[in-house]
Each structure stands twice: as C-alpha cells, then as structure tokens.
C-alpha cells in the first residue's frame, strides 16, 4: 500500500460545520486512515534570503491515508466531508514515498 498526504484547502469555516460528517468518514475508510492529522493555523514562511512572511498558502489541515494507487485514494475521498462543504473546498493529494 502507498501512503498519501491529503492537504485540505479552503476558506475558514465554523468548527461545527467543518467537522460534520468526519466520524462517519473515518469509520467508512477504516484501516486506510494512517493519521487523522490536524487543523493548521497561524502559518508563516521562511524564504531563501532569510526573510520571513506571514503570507502562506491557505491550508486548513492534513490527513494521511493509504491506498493501492491514485484511483484508490479517489475512492476514499469522493465523499469526504471537507469537499462536500462546497466547490471552494479542495483536497490536494500527494504520494508520500516510504523510506
């Protein structure tokens, strides 16, 4: 099984709205969930010239799942409660190679 990082990207939401449906999704994907992850707040960036910026990519949080391939991940996240919030919410998926 391959591991995939899910990055949640979208406008801020009320905590109740953004977490609705997550327990059911966790139950549905079962052992495919490697790490529930966490919300992400107060980001900043360090640039190559040593300067710091408070402007970053808007990321709401992350999770890690495992699947055979990209199609398997798409099956896992097709009904993810985050994307069901609306078209302005996206999940970016990246394969995380094992060491």
Write out the residue ranges for each language-model feature:
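Conserved, structured core segments of small domains
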Residues: 1-99
């Amino acid at each position: 099984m391959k591991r995939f990082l899910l990055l949640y990207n979208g406008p801020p939401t009320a905590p109740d709205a953004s977490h609705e449906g997550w327990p059911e999704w966790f139950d549905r994907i079962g052992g495919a969930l490697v790490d529930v992850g966490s919300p992400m707040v107060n980001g900043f960036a360090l640039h190559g010239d040593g300067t710091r910026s408070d402007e970053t990519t808007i990321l709401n949080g992350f999770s890690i799942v495992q699947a055979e391939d990209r199609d398997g991940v798409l099956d896992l996240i097709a009904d993810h409660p985050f994307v069901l919030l609306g078209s302005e919410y996206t999940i970016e998926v990246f394969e995380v190679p094992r060491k």
